[in-house]
Amino acid sequence: MDYMVRRTDKELSQRKLEEYANFSKIINAGRQNPIWFSEFMYGVKLMDYQKWAFMESWYKPFVLWLEGRGAGKTTLAAVFLQTKMLLIPDYKVFISTNSAQQSIEVFKKIEDLALQRIPSFKTVTDIFANEVDKGVNSETGFLHNPAGHSFKLYNNSELVTLSTNLNAIRGKRGSVFYDETSWQTAEQMAVTENFINVDSSFGLGTTKNAHKDPIQMPLQLLYASSAGDVTFPFYEKYCTFSKKMFLGDKNYFVCDINADTVLNHSTVDGVKIKSHLTKEQIDAVNTIID
């Protein structure tokens, strides 16, 4: 008599096994090269300085982008967060700004990119939009709740906008994206920075695992802003993070992209392109500042 011992509680067909194998190959290839993934799967082309900031920020827990107006930091953040959420299961991100309206503007950038509403991105696909959990109350899955805009992917990754009511947002856990951080107060940062104070790889169970779980992607604090007042905490973080990066601490990354970089060094795959900023625009702003 022959006995058949099933390897899993659920039988999978050969076709289904092949689908899962191909899916795993694509996901793992994307984790190794997220720039390729965002271009090939999303149809989004980034400039070279954006690619550099993207890759250096991929796995580091503490990241700061100091970028001038027109450098495309919000667009870069939209692509970065979309890629990270799709490639990393159970990855939760909060958006923190100086007001609920600003958080919603960042959310809308991600939503518009996913739903192919940005004319300057001519080859965007619907792959990310198809990964958004539609639920039963939303046609697109992007929920516009007054208490906080949000959406969730089928892999249980989630993005939520935060209000400025500090008592209402205490105790949450997840990564945080700060936009226009130069004017955010120390009190507000102190509340949201505690969101990452948990080991993302920690887990318990009632049985011993016969395998080792993979190390999870660390939670991240990503500060993005143009330059502002040196009396706010963003300036102090810029100095501290820069020193740690220069000393070789691999947990920190800082990029400083000014108007000159955008004007004179805008390239795609090493080929110089026409900048979307002009010298006249930059001179006009400098005249106002002076």
Segments (PLM) and residue ranges:
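Phosphate/NTP-binding elements of NTP-utilizing enzymes
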Residues: 2-290
